[in-house]
Amino acid sequence: MYSLLKANKIANEYEGEKFILIESFKFANASYERTAKKPMVDRASGKAVRGITYTPDFVSEHFIIEVKGRANESFPLRWKLFKRLLHNNNDTRVLYKPQSQADCKTVVEDILKRFYNGNV
């Protein structure tokens, strides 16, 4: 994707923005949890729970691109939370999630048509 964007002189930043999907917080309640080799005990009371962030591959003022060959287990939920964040913040950038070289070429063609009047 990087080489296609560069070859077509499409302005972007690689991992240029980090989005906070869920803020970190302190969990005050008791939370009895088991780990692989340890018994079930209160593991969370008073401890910080890490936030959830998302950093797309390529960003610009017009679009966001996440190149995904195979999504890991957490990606579908993270992607939904990301879309919700964009919606709630009235972010109107176009989202692209190509999964193959052919998809990447289609994305570049669409970006050129939408934002560069078909050329650079």
Briefly describe each language-model feature range.
Residues 1-120:
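Electrostatic, structured charged patches in enzyme active sites and in nucleic-acid/phosphate-binding
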